[in-house]
Each structure stands twice: as structure tokens, then as C-alpha cells.
Amino acid sequence: MEINNRCQKKYISIKTEFLKICLVCFILISNKFQKFEEKKNNPKRKLKVGVIGLDHHKNIGNNILKYAMSVQLKELGVDPYIIGYNTGKGIKFIAEKTNLVSINNFDQLNQTDYDILMVNSDQTWRFWNRRFEDIAFLKFAENWTIPKFVYGASIGTSHWSFSNKTNYLAKKLLKNFTGISVREMGTIKYVKQYLNMSAIYVLDPSMLIDKAYYLDAIKDYKKIINKTDYILTYKLDYIYNMEKFINITKKKLKFYIYDIQLNDEEYIEKFLSGIYNCKAVITNSYHGVLFSIIFNKPFVAFKNINRGNERFNTIKEVYGIKDRFFDMHKNPSLDLLFTPLRFNNKIINYYRNISIEYLKKNLNIL
């Protein structure tokens, strides 16, 4: 009797183990079948990349960067989501041309919605930014396990403005990032000095894509200025020498002076069209200079010490343009407005390749 009981218990134990094995096999087969079905229904599921940047608001550089990065990431075969706080102003362009995600709080974002997070370029590392730690170092995603990296962060000035507390937090949060890159050459040494980390230089996102994308973006824009020949002026701030030069240009040249005002919903189209169709550009804007280069327009740029000159210094170094930047005490020659723009395409292409390879590496698509 005792032997029978032992045999019966052993039989039940073996049967239980067998059923467990069958259950595990069933689950494994079911999972494989489910993944097979998912792949069959969606064989080319794209990598979902959350692109964190400054607030969605009316700003030329901010919005063009978002557009350009979205285009570049799509060219690399991933699915970008342009994430930012929604101010409800001036976002028509990027709302129409990107996968825009407008939020009111970073807590609205879920790790399961994205495969990778990246900090986009522009002044995302400028210390006065609202929601600075969440934008600059992705603090809201501190415990997320997906890969994170920084593309082309700018500190916006010629000096490092992080406090000791912020330096400590940056080190803590950035240590698990797969890559750190900056938009100005001079920032590399600050990252090493204050964060003890390595960073590389990459191009502003607007320089990554072909100008054909910008021309396509304005192909339906109808409000082109009704002047055959004009010189475009684009001012961020009042600079005495710049105003003086503009007035001299008005008096001595026969060209119409078009002082572009970005005060309507189509301000990005107006900006792109204005530079593309002009004879020359007078500006104190970083992106005013970059788009003069993109559209190959002669330009004169005035430095603004309050905004920092590191961005212009980097352009001079990388693009090989030395003679078109002027401080408050120097007066440019009018001849520059008619002197063809010369820049080093070989160097630009070199850094463009480095920038795109950096993206590929951190997106794990090499």
C-alpha cells in the first residue's frame, strides 16, 4: 500500500512537471507566433526616437532645427517624434511637417512609447532655460532604461554658466548617455573641464540636409516680396554699427532694403523665401548666417556680445569664412555685399559625415 502511494505521488509529480513544461512550451510558441504575426503585419517597424528640445514656440532657429532633424532622422530610416512644451504660438510649420508631440508636463511621456531618447540641438544647455534639467539632461527619464544621447547642445554663450550643483547633476545624469556632442567648438573643453566627459563637435541640424528640402518647404509660399533686387536685413537685437551700415547701404546702393519682420504664421516660409530670393544678407543672427551659406548668398554679420560670439567663431573655423563678421567697433565694406561667398565645402562635408555617423552610432544603425 505504501509503495502504491509513493508511486502515485511520483506519478502526480512527474505529471505536474510535464504539464509545466508543456505550459512553458506553449507560452514560448505563442510568443514566437505573436512576434511572427507582428512582423508579418508590420515587417519594417521603424525605431521610435523621442527628440527632446526647447518649447514649441515662434522661433526661427528652434523650429528649423526641429524640421531639419526630423528630415535627417527619417532619411536614416527611423521614426522621429518632436517633443516639447506647447505654447500654442507659431508652430504651424513644424506641426504640418513633423510628428509633433506637444506636452504640458514631461510626466505625460512613457518609456514604452520610444526606443531611444535624444536631446536635440539649439541652446538646450543654456542655463536660463525653463525646465532646464529635463530638457538638457533628460532628468524626467532618469530611471528609463532605453538609450539616450545628446546631439549638438549649445550653451548659448562664450562661457560655462552651470553652477556646481548643476555640474554634479549633469555628471550623474549624463554618465549613462551613449554620446555627447555640442554645436560650438569652444564647448568641448568646458565639458571636459567641468563634467570630466568627452564631447565631439557636430554641425547644426539645419546644415545636415540638402537645401532642396527647404525649397520644397516653400514651394507653395505665395507672399514673395515684389522686388526683383533686394538686400535682406534680419535683426535679433539693436546694434548701432549694424543700423549705421544698413543706413549707408540704403543711401549708396540702388537696391531695396527688405527688413524682414517675422510676425505672421508663415514666418518660417517668409524667412526661407526671403533669403533664397535676395541678393545679399545683413544680419546678427546665427541662423541668418547659416541660411546665407545654405543658399550661397553674400552676407555681412554683426557680432552681439550679449548673445556670445562662440557660434560665429565656430562658423569661421569650420566653414572657412573669415572676413564677414564684425564687432561693434568695425565697419564693413559695401563691396562684401557683392563679393561671391567662398567657403570650404570639403571641410563642411567632412563634419557633415562625422555628424551623420554620430547619429547612426547612437541610433545603433551602423
Protein language model annotation of sequence segments:
Residues 2-366:
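Active-site anion-handling motifs in enzyme catalytic cores
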